[in-house]
Amino acid sequence: SGVALITKHTEAARRFSIAMQRRRTEKIYQTLVHGWPSEDTFTINAPLLRRGEVEHSPIWLKRMVHKDGQSAVTRTRVLERIQHSGEQYSFLEVTPVTGRTHQIRVHLSHIGHPIVGDKIYQDETCYLRFIEDGWTSELEKQLLFPRQALHASKLTFHFEEGDLSWAAPFPEGLKLSC
């Protein structure tokens, strides 16, 4: 969920595409994860590879941290630590420095704090069961939400004449009440 950019004119699309190619953009995400990270701010620097390239994976698109993968860096800041139904959760602000497929999801799972509702990187059997049976009460108990609690909260383009930014608040449907 969150901010997505769509242009109506070819020239605008060209300018935004060039800015993205030149890495003159910044995307900030908000997410709800399991557990409480030990640090309030930290950087995850771990290369990513499609899991099926090095071992069997029933989910073709699943990525993993692997020494032979592409460089991937994610900056993270804890916004809030939450106690809910006897469990610990954290609300994070996450900024990918690189832009690898599933980067945020893989990195957070890798450090032991998977995104709430993530069917692939929390427990991949959830995804396989979801494909077979759809959304069930058992999946709801395990995942809490029918989708991952990852939200594109802000998108900024840095142009010579100034920055352009768009923001979207975290969805109410993905919040936990304390």
Report residues per predicted region.
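RNA pseudouridine synthases
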Residues: 1-178
